[in-house]
Amino acid sequence: DAKILNSHKDLHICARDTKSLDYLKNALSCNLLLVPDMAFCISQKTLDRYKQKETDKALFLKRNDQELCEYDFSLYIAEKVEQLHIGDWPTMEKEFKTKVYLDKLVFRRKRLKRIPDIYADLIFRPFQVRKGIEFVSKYRKVYTTRLHVAILSVLLDKEIIFFDNSYGKNRSFYETWLKDVEKLKFVQ
């Protein structure tokens, strides 16, 4: 509720695109900041550590949920089928078993309630970053409907075709942060 948020004396809210920032400006009177997505904080050292040898194949990383916006993707994909890997994030296609197990646990004792957060910070998030870099870095060109794949592809200096999602999140982020990236083409 905006009234509750506005009553806070020192509240700072970060938005990752100008559309979200404008919405917040109309609803709130707190400190608002426009900041890029945290994925841009992946260090060059981390990218170099997990980067794989690039092949001549292209990747079409296509989400399979309610955010997917249907396009005639064939109008934008130049590669032949044998030169194209089509799929979603490896961690989205096959959930990380330990995460699923921990998600089902109910921590009743106060001291144990932080275990899922500690696990996410120390194990699961670094695992996802590593897997993402290893996966995306193998391809010379990336077609994607996922924002974080586009960001990772920018960090890896890939040629990118970036498709909007069902409610314009990708377009808003592109217009705020990615429109000047030479190797990136956006499809609305």
Label every PLM stretch briefly.
Residues 1-188:
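Active-site anion-handling motifs in enzyme catalytic cores
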